């Protein structure tokens, strides 16, 4: 049988092969949004077995296993690591058509030199081989990053985080990869969360002030933003179920915050007013510091109440939202632009039905001397498969200038997920190669190769000012 993963994987014509192998393949990786643990990088975590490395916290895999009816004990429960790996291996063949199938075999091939298909027959051979390698030098958290040619990553961090692990990494001259924090203040934006007031109290503690009113909350946020800035942070990230926008004055925001603090229920309008004012305050602060603002919009979180109570958040029970989007997004960006305080912004939509809304909106807010100031963020989460990536690139190209795109990110908690950059690069090269093949683009490898390199590396390097 011909190897499943070979040099031509996903490259369906000679033009795609030239673009990938001559222009994209060897570029370093800038992974500007991920969920890796800075502590695990600082400590250069070693993994006892493949279940620790591969299945711990990977809700993509968990969802696939549940879809096949696998008992929860083999997913997040009491089964042994070997039993959990076996359950995943039995699942893999049935993931055909899902990116998990490609990612699984790319990861085995690139990091463990495993060329066989993972399934019920091969699981023990793969388990033993990979676990043996994990005990050797060169198979730690940092080693996987180095082997992947990673240059720079952005983690996702709560405002309460002391960032000590990031500082340890920065001070370690033996490790050249830059690991920088991103400011993720969702717990402050979501004023109707049951835990909101408790979180605000903790925020005040780390910001060295008592948060008794809305003005003090804004000061606490500013204190933490500046703390993050001193630790090397240059990005913020916001996860929003929908895009809020409702005009709000400072006095109104103060009243709404006080109402929540006194235990009264807030209306949807009050919630949106608070969110709008607070997001605008933060965005202006980001602008003043030269940060990039990321908006991840459109996920419904923790939809299965029974399983949320059993397992908590980020365990595979989230999905795509639908909502009123175009007007609030444009109003929010316009408000900041009108005041001359719109930071570089990346807008991600989880719902691909809104691709054209985002792709057209970003063109409304250009800036002289800045290439692609407002970006249509990479195909995300339920869209980071071949069809989703192609749809995103085509939609961006159709109504914008896709050569300005800042490229792929892993959005992952796994140290093996850097193969997603290879996956993305192959898809980009195959897409452009198909345009050449169909006569829709010239066979100008030097020019198109430069566009490939920009999308895969250089645009991000420039956008995040990494030079």
UniProtKB/Swiss-Prot annotation:
Gene Ontology molecular-function annotations: glucuronate isomerase activity
Superkingdom classification of source: Bacteria
EC supergroup of this enzyme: isomerase
GO BP, sorted A to Z: D-galacturonate catabolic process; D-glucuronate catabolic process
InterPro entries: Metal_Hydrolase, Uronate_isomerase
Catalytic activity: D-glucuronate = D-fructuronate; aldehydo-D-galacturonate = keto-D-tagaturonate
Pathway(s) of this molecule: Carbohydrate metabolism; pentose and glucuronate interconversion
Cystine residue pairs: none
EC number, as in UniProt: 5.3.1.12
UniProt KW keywords: Isomerase
Homology family: Belongs to the metallo-dependent hydrolases superfamily. Uronate isomerase family.
Protein's name according to its UniProt entry: Uronate isomerase
Natural source organism: Geobacillus thermodenitrificans (strain NG80-2)
């Amino acid at each position: 049988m011909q190897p499943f993963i070979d040099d031509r994987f996903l490259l369906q014509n000679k033009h795609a092969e030239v673009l990938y192998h001559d222009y994209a393949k060897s570029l370093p990786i800038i992974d500007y949004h991920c969920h890796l643990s800075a502590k695990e990088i600082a400590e250069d975590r070693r993994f006892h077995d493949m279940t620790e490395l591969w299945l711990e916290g990977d809700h993509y895999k968990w969802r696939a296993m549940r879809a096949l009816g696998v008992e929860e004990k083999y997913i997040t429960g009491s089964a042994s690591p070997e039993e959990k790996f076996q359950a995943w291996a039995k699942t893999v063949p049935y993931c055909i058509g899902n990116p998990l199938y490609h990612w699984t075999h790319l990861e085995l091939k690139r990091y463990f030199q495993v060329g066989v298909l993972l399934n019920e027959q091969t699981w023990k051979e793969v388990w033993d081989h990979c676990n043996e390698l994990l005990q050797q030098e060169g198979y730690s958290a940092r080693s996987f990053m180095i082997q992947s040619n990673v240059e720079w990553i952005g983690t996702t961090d709560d405002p309460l985080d002391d960032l000590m692990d990031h500082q340890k990494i920065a001070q370690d001259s033996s490790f050249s990869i830059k690991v920088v924090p991103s400011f993720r203040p969702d717990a402050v934006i979501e004023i109707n969360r049951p835990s909101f007031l408790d979180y605000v109290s903790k925020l005040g503690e780390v910001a060295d002030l008592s948060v008794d009113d809305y003005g003090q909350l804004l000061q606490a946020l500013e204190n933490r933003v500046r703390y993050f800035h001193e630790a090397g942070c240059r990005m913020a990230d916001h996860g929003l179920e929908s895009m809020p926008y409702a005009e709000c004055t400072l006095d109104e925001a103060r009243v709404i915050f006080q109402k929540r603090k006194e235990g009264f229920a807030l209306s949807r309008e009050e919630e949106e007013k608070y969110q709008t004012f607070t997001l605008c305050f933060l965005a202006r602060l980001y602008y003043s510091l030269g940060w990039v603002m990321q908006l991840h919009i459109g996920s419904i979180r923790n939809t299965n109440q029974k399983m949320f109570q059993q397992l908590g958040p980020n365990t595979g029970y989230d999905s795509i939202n639908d909502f009123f989007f175009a007007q609030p997004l444009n109003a929010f960006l316009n408000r900041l632009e009108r005041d001359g305080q719109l930071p570089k912004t990346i807008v991600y939509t989880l719902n691909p039905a809104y691709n054209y809304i985002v792709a057209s909106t970003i063109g409304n807010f250009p800036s002289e001397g800045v290439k692609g100031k407002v970006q249509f963020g990479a195909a995300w989460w339920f869209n980071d498969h071949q069809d989703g990536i192609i749809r995103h690139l085509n939609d961006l190209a159709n109504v914008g200038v896709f050569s300005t795109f800042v490229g792929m990110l892993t959005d992952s908690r796994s140290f093996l997920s850097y193969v997603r950059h290879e996956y993305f690069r192959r898809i980009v090269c195959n897409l452009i190669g198909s345009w050449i093949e169909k006569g829709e683009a010239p066979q100008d490898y030097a020019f198109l190769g430069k566009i490939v390199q920009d999308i895969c590396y250089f645009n991000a390097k420039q956008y995040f000012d990494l030079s």
